[in-house]
Amino acid sequence: MSALLQLRKATIRFGGLTAVSELDLQIAHGELVGLIGPNGAGKTTAFNLITGVYQPTGGEIVFDGKSLARSKPYRITARGIARTFQNIRLFPSLTVFDNVRAVFHLHLRGDVRHALWRGKGYHAEEQSIADRVMDLLEIFQLGKFRDEAAKNLSYGDQRRLEIVRALAARPKLLLLDEPAAGMNATEKVELTRLIQFIKDKFQISILLVEHDMKVVMGICERIVVLDYGIKIADGKPDEVRANPKVIAAYLGQEM
């Protein structure tokens, strides 16, 4: 499989602290990769590098054959990278439908004059967006909540809605930042099935940061391990589980 995303010695420093050090990471088209490590290992920082929240102080990041150097987050999203966050970031007072529609509007082809004029093209585009929003909501069993405020959904459904919003950006690569956080055992099982379904249904690559090792080991084809910003392992789940460096990093924790 060819590489969709490549980090080549990607490094970021904050003052005298090196948060991520010379990270080499590749994700192939259609691959599901886990990124794990103890608290403070640099996982979310790596996500922020990939999505343009931070700019690397060294190395480079290449996506779909083109450098992401100095790209703003919204441009990176338009290029095909979408993400979720550790803390759910929905519009709580907007309906489920409008939360997803807002993302589709980022890709609206018409300019401001086109929208103000509200001609046939505008209305056709709006109807197309509404249809696509409902298609996504139905796929993820959220259609029945279309007119419900996002804040009224259960925690698990809010997580699901956040993932739907990310998919509305039509990404080639989906970054999931601790999607199982705060979920009970039943919700985690459902999440695992959902992530595998997304990969198969939408034929996209997924990079998953997650502390729950059962989730990671159960669905990831390959796992990359960070410790203090340094990559200490990269391999199949069974290889990573048996790696002495990984065992030492997770000393006292269940693998």
Task: Please give the residue ranges for each predicted region.
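Glycine-rich phosphate-binding loops of nucleotide-dependent enzymes
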Residues: S2-M255
